[in-house]
């Protein structure tokens, strides 16, 4: 028996093949089978008829560094299919935070978010602090 089944979806698999109807069967956290057969047993089953099933998307240039400090679930990314996000590479990241520019940097970063970051209570100023905060509070 499979752990999970996603049945009757339109599969877009990233291989440049045309989308096709299929059922995915998952065992031990991995896709074990992709088939047109939707009759196989699974502990949990989802009907994906009328929906697209695809691998998760990678966001290679985002500005979500600080978002994860205030909204760790970040549902918007998940709803859009993003399952991996690279942060901190654009030059406007708040991490690492130069102590001399802390107030100005946080004011600038806050201008892009509904949350205003207080320089006195900002939870992370270096990579270790950021990683520790993310580890403690988690992300989706």
Spans of model-derived segments:
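Histidine-rich, glycine-flanked metal-binding segment
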Residues: 1-5, 11-56, 71
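Di-metal (Zn2+ and/or Mg2+/Mn2+) metal-binding site signature of metallo-dependent hydrolases
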Residues: 52-76
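Flexible loop/turn segments at secondary-structure boundaries
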Residues: 13, 65, 92-96
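Short glycine-rich, polar/acidic loop-and-turn segments at beta strand-coil junctions
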Residues: 28-30, 62, 89-91
């Amino acid at each position: 028996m499979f752990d999970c089944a996603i049945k009757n979806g339109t599969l877009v698999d990233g291989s440049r093949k045309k989308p096709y109807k299929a059922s995915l069967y998952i065992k031990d956290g991995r896709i074990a089978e992709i088939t047109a057969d939707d009759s196989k047993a699974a502990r949990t089953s989802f009907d994906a008829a009328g929906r697209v099933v695809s691998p998760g998307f990678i966001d290679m240039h985002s500005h979500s560094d600080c978002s994860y400090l205030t909204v760790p679930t970040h549902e918007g990314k998940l709803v859009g299919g993003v399952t991996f996000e690279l942060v901190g590479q654009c030059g406007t990241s708040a991490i690492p935070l130069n102590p001399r520019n802390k107030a100005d940097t946080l004011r600038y970063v806050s201008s892009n978010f509904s949350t205003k970051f207080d320089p006195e209570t900002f939870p992370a100023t270096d990579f270790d602090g950021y990683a520790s905060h993310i580890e403690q509070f988690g992300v989706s």
